[in-house]
């Protein structure tokens, strides 16, 4: 090949055009633009083509003018083609139809393509396949260039169609050489060096390979193409209603307590949380101290509470004197029924001397005087004597009575000023018909009153607990004798209801006792309800 290339180079430099044409016919080769073409521009290529190619042909001598027209047209088409890294200049007869090219001699029809490895002999059919590969995306393997090239090789190797090749001038190629398959592979691997890493050689398809339609996402560019589900916009829109906040009724338990407490005048915050049970511990008595939240206007009159608890039946008799803000005489608070409930047997007793509520609230004093003695006549000859006790007696007996069974049911009225709880123990003896009774007295006076003495006809003795709220305010003095006479006179209706037990049960908790609507401050006694 080097000899052939040097011979063609010497012919191109020295010989005249007729001698050059004769030399081509003898060698049976077509003149190719030599290695000088890589260093010259396209105008020199056009001039060299116009000088070299218009030689008289043996088969068509009068066609010189026609060849000159074809070469003038070819001058605008003749450009170096960039195949891969190195440009490849194809012969003129490959670019222009109708040119009487001298490769039609019967001796041989092979041409050369300049590559980096030197000139490679290629048949005309394979030169056309180079253009077919240039038009097809060779880098994508799903296009299957080898299958199409083998089909065209079979077409052109069997018989050349004269209509498909007009420049052959109705002449068949006598025998197509079989060796150029290997050089064509070398050319394609040279022009496309990345193709060898993608799979088998381009012109030798793998066995059993058929030109099927390309499979989706099988190309090397498939990672650049997102899946079809990402291109659909609705999965982005579907999660949008999820962050919509759902309203959760968190303040509903508080509103239920506020509705329940709105029916009562200013109830404490812990209303209904501590039912009146007989097993209340001293810790639960401290939990009853949220009574301090109440407005002092509700309890401008602070009273003594006497609760007689029947020991075996876990029932308490409410004998408390209470004063609530001014209410009508016939107004009764709605009873709340619970299991461990107290018997509401309180009856209003008229007071002779009652100061106005503003004076009582401002002075912070209690309505009842601690110096009066109350004698209550109980059935079967029982008598409870209320004796005055000094304020110094109560703290001495404070720590001796903390028992969880008796301290359970004591009621504490709300003082105007919170003070220390003073608890005292005393012996109270009272006779029930078949049982001993526990008497729990809660005194809210400035000077606490303690049960003293013994009950007549005694058959059982019960120890009773006292709970005191001391007040630092000035004591309001009242007529003790008249109050004692009132209490003795009002204690008469107490006998009959206890004997026949025809008492309507009013079940209250530890805080509703402070809300019993009584018009005036009176001594609490029993009265029958039918």
From Swiss-Prot:
Q: Which InterPro entries match?
A: RAI2/SOBP
Looking up Pfam families in the UniProt record yields: SOBP (PF15279)
Q: Where is the composition biased (Polar residues)?
A: 1-13
Instruction: Choose any GO biological process term that the UniProt entry carries and state it.
Output: embryo development ending in birth or egg hatching
What do the Gene Ontology cellular component annotations say? Answer: nucleus
Q: Where is this region: Disordered?
A: 1-22
Q: What is this protein called?
A: Retinoic acid-induced protein 2
Originating gene? RAI2
């Amino acid at each position: 090949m080097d000899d052939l290339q040097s011979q063609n180079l010497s012919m191109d430099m020295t010989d005249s055009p007729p001698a050059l044409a004769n030399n081509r016919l003898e060698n049976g080769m077509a003149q190719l633009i030599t290695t000088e073409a890589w260093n010259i521009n396209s105008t020199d290529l056009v001039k060299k083509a116009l000088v070299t190619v218009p030689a008289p042909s043996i088969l068509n001598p009068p066609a010189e003018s026609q060849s000159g027209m074809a070469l003038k047209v070819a001058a605008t088409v003749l450009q170096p083609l960039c195949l891969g890294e190195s440009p490849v200049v194809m012969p003129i007869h490959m670019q222009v139809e109708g040119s009487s090219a001298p490769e039609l001699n019967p001796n041989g029809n092979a041409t050369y393509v300049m590559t980096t490895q030197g000139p490679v002999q290629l048949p005309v059919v394979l030169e056309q396949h180079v253009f077919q590969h240039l038009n097809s995306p060779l880098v994508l393997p799903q296009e299957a260039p080898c299958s199409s090239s083998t089909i065209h090789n079979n077409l052109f190797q069997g018989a050349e169609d004269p209509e498909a090749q007009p420049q052959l001038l109705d002449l068949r190629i006598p025998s197509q050489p079989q060796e150029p398959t290997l050089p064509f592979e070398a050319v394609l691997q040279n022009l496309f060096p990345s193709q060898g890493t993608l799979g088998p050689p381009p012109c030798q398809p793998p066995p059993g390979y058929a030109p099927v339609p390309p499979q989706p996402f099988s190309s090397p560019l498939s990672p650049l193409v997102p899946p079809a589900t990402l291109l659909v916009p609705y999965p982005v829109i579907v999660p949008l209603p999820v962050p919509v906040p759902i309203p959760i009724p968190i303040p509903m338990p508080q509103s239920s307590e506020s509705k329940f407490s709105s029916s009562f005048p200013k109830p404490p915050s812990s209303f209904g949380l501590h039912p009146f049970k007989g097993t209340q511990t001293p810790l639960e008595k401290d939990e009853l101290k949220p009574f301090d939240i109440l407005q002092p206007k509700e309890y401008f009159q602070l009273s003594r509470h006497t609760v007689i608890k029947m020991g075996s039946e876990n029932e308490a008799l409410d004998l408390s004197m209470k004063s609530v803000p001014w209410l009508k005489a016939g107004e009764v608070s709605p009873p709340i029924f619970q299991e461990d409930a107290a018997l509401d047997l309180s009856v209003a007793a008229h007071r002779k001397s009652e100061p106005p509520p503003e004076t009582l609230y401002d002075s912070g004093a209690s309505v009842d005087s601690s110096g009066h003695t109350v004698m209550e006549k109980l059935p079967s000859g029982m008598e409870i004597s209320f004796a005055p006790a000094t304020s110094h007696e109560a703290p001495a007996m404070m720590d001796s009575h903390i028992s969880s069974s008796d301290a359970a049911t004591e009621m504490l009225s709300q003082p105007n000023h919170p003070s220390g709880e003073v608890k005292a123990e005393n012996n109270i003896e009272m006779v029930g018909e078949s049982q001993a009774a526990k008497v729990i007295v809660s005194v809210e006076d400035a000077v606490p009153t303690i049960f003293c003495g013994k009950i007549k006809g005694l058959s059982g003795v019960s120890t009773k607990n006292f709970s005191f709220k001391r007040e630092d305010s000035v004591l309001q003095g009242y007529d003790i004798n008249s109050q004692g006479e009132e209490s003795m006179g009002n204690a008469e209706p107490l006998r009959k209801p206890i004997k026949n037990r025809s008492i309507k049960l009013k079940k209250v908790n530890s805080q509703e006792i402070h809300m019993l609507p009584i018009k005036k401050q009176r001594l609490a006694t029993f009265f029958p309800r039918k």
